[in-house]
Amino acid sequence: MKGIRNFKEFIKAGIVKIQTPDKSRAEFLIKEAEQGYNYLLEVIEKIGIKNENANDYIKRCYDILMELVRAKMLVDGYNASGYGAHEAEVSYLRTLDFREIDVQFADQMRFFRNGMLYYGTILDKEYAEKVIKFTKENYLKLKKMS
């Protein structure tokens, strides 16, 4: 996995477009993330974390965090689409003053989620626990920014 590019490079490449802020779409994404987060916590409490549900939790965590990043981007007047959009959204975390180690972890989540969706990658309980911890640590921070 190579290092993630700077956000401005995604603008230059046309992957991120500058647009009028879209607060209504951002509000929708925030609400979706909130519902997804609450559901995630409920399912974890009732079912627990196992190897058998690790992939599902990892995908859900990634989606929750990226919905909040997309919401913040929309409020700030940015929209990522097409090939490289997910990488651009992860890169946007740097502009939000996330630590580089957290940007790299989010990029690793993106990489593994892509592997799950397109290549049949199977992840384990241990990694799912790390992802859930990361999500819990960053959910409120992102939500407050959005």
Please tell me what each predicted stretch does.
Residues 1-146:
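Terminal alpha-helical segments
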